[in-house]
Swiss-Prot record:
One of its GO terms (biological process) is mitochondrion organization. Disruption phenotype: Decreased abscisic acid (ABA) sensitivity during seed germination and seedling growth. Abnormal mitochondria extensively internally vacuolated and characterized by a reduced ABA-stimulated reactive oxygen species (ROS) production associated with the inhibition of ABA-induced AOX1a and ABI4 gene expression. Highly expressed in germinating seeds and developing seedlings. Also present at low levels in seedlings, roots, leaves, stems and flowers, and barely in siliques. It is found in: Mitochondrion membrane; Mitochondrion. The gene is RRL. This is Protein RETARDED ROOT GROWTH-LIKE. Its main location: mitochondrion. GO terms for cellular component: mitochondrial membrane; mitochondrion. Mediates abscisic acid (ABA) signal transduction through mitochondrial retrograde regulation involving ABI4 during seed germination and seedling growth, and leading to the production of reactive oxygen species (ROS) by the alternative respiratory pathway. Required for the maintenance of mitochondrial structure. The keyword NAD does not apply.
Amino acid sequence: MMRSVDVYVKTLGPPVRSILYSIFTSQQKPSSLPSLPFHFSLRSSSNIPTRCFSNVVAKSNSPIYDFQGFRNLFTERAISSSTTTPVASAQPQQLQNQNQHPAEVDEEISMGLEDEAKLSIPVRAYFFSTSVDLRSLIEQNKQNFIPPTSRMTNYVVLKFGNHSDPTDTTRGRISGSESIYMVVFHYGSIVLFNVREHEVDEYLKVVERHASGLLPEMRKDEYEVRENPNLDTWMEVGRDFIRLQFLNTDGIRTIGCVLGQSIALDYYGRQVDGMVAEFTEINRQLEITGTFTMKRKKLFQLVGKANVILADVILKLGLFERSDIAWKDAKYGQIWEFLRDEFELTQSFANLDYKLKFVEHNVRFLQEILQNRKSATLEWLIIILISMEIAISFYNMSRASL
């Protein structure tokens, strides 16, 4: 019987022959069969041995296709299935990992957002007066006053909170602490760092007692600073925020300077817009009626207002003066330049200057009209006086002739 099997096996390919010889020459005991993992799987990734044996059984007329042939065939199927058992058993574990993966990702994302929120420092800028007495403000807040590090004298920095100052070292962190910083400028701007929105009024009242020229409507703006000690570069920028390795008092002064100028420039820009609108209405009436009813006093008031705005922007705001801190350290110079571009200070001043020139042109034009009107009145007065003098002369001549 083995000879017939050997003859038949020679007709098969070398791989199949090696497999068949290993099976038929196997000396396994029947008692060892139950130890095999009889796991039938239709998803087996190793179907080649099974397919070979099914073909052999179908075409073979050998009498071994009885108990022994069936036993060997069954053994090989069991072996083939046992090789796929780890794959099949690994699939539920993989599916379980896949089911757990979204939850872990969501948890990591939420933790990342929480860490980002902890490292975020809200910055709020306000403009509600045209002047602040910095000397009296310092006198009443000596315990909160931070001495200046530059020669700039148009602002002061106050720190509130019971925590030790985290900015006395270059690697101090403000985010995640209760430390609050307030930069107050003598021209009326206030910039708050790390202050919650519901606490703003409390800190504005500290300055309000030393302010003059309170405005009927307060201007405000918001920004955000994010600290990241692991940042590869000193600074990264984003939409409505700037990310730094750390934020100290020099950074607070630099950022506060630009935001204070920006919010004040916005206020003055709106004042000039009101003047432009008023002159536009005058020109429209002049176009329709050919005359205007503005008094000389009102015109002079507009001239004075335009000159004051221009002087405040150039002198008080120090719009073209680079911060001393930015001059000394290139890192803060980088912040200063970026924020000026971000808030478009140069472009805003250019627009304001252009509008002021429009106002100046209209003022000069209206002054000429008023001057011509005054000249015409004087001319008529002179004509009347000359006429009266001629009339008196004729009267005297008539009396003398009589």
